[in-house]
Amino acid sequence: MDTELLKTFLEVSRTRHFGRAAESLYLTQSAVSFRIRQLENQLGVNLFTRHRNNIRLTAAGEKLLPYAEMLMSTWQAARKEVAHTSRHNEFSIGASASLWECMLNQWLGRLYQNQDAHTGLQFEARIAQRQSLVKQLHERQLDLLITTEAPKMDEFSSQLLGYFTLALYTSAPSKLKGDLNYLRLEWGPDFQQHEAGLIGADEVPILTTSSAELAQQQIAMLNGCTWLPVSWARKKGGLHTVVDSTTLSRPLYAIWLQNSDKNALIRDLLKINVLDEVY
């Protein structure tokens, strides 16, 4: 049986709401409904009664609940033990491509330079979308997540690392927003909520990417503009701020599991300033 189906079943039974379960699992509501239907088809019974927003466990669902909890607990314990033996000297850090390119690459170098206290530690730099990395963190497949958004789940610990400044850049001086095509560089869902006010309500991006390097290279070819970290853009050279634009500050967070067996190591590594190169 697919453990993801059981995990979804447990979350729906806990929240009694498909939408809230979807939010907790970082899934769409339709994906949660599909998983529940799959599980019901495998078992040949209905697990929930649905009357508008009133979702309750059926008698079959009530019987499944303790077994599902036991199976998931056993599975998580098995994964933890196996992972512990194979990843004893490994430490995985996840972030978006733009964060790695603009600031974390330098931090990773500093981690290696300060390895005296952690000789033999092997780092893995993992690039993926935030939603995927949160899932990996929750499933103990990732040790540390660096992101621009605070955690939304109680089982995560977090540390605010500081702030960095974004500005709207293009490849030529004295340009206005109205003269340029917009290239969307992904800085998180909360940034996108304010994007229309920063660019223009009717502005549709001609390119969307999670890579700052790619966006920067495309600016000149596409007569475009995009939001880049100020310090990184200045070091790159050949970039100019759009005349009628503003700057904005973005937070940077480190997130990890509260009950991670690498808690002490994580706090040690975070003493090495992530934002030395950015303000």
From Swiss-Prot:
Q: Which residues form the HTH lysR-type domain?
A: 1-58
GO MF annotation terms: DNA binding; DNA-binding transcription factor activity
Q: Which residues bind DNA?
A: 18-37
The record's annotation in Gene3D superfamilies points to: Periplasmic binding protein-like II, Winged helix-like DNA-binding domain superfamily/Winged helix DNA-binding domain
- Domain of life according to the entry: Bacteria
The family annotation for this protein states: Belongs to the LysR transcriptional regulatory family.
The record's section on HAMAP family has:
HTH_type_HdfR
Spell out the protein name for this chain: HTH-type transcriptional regulator HdfR
Q: Which organism is it from?
A: Shigella boydii serotype 18 (strain CDC 3083-94 / BS512)
Name the gene for this chain.
hdfR
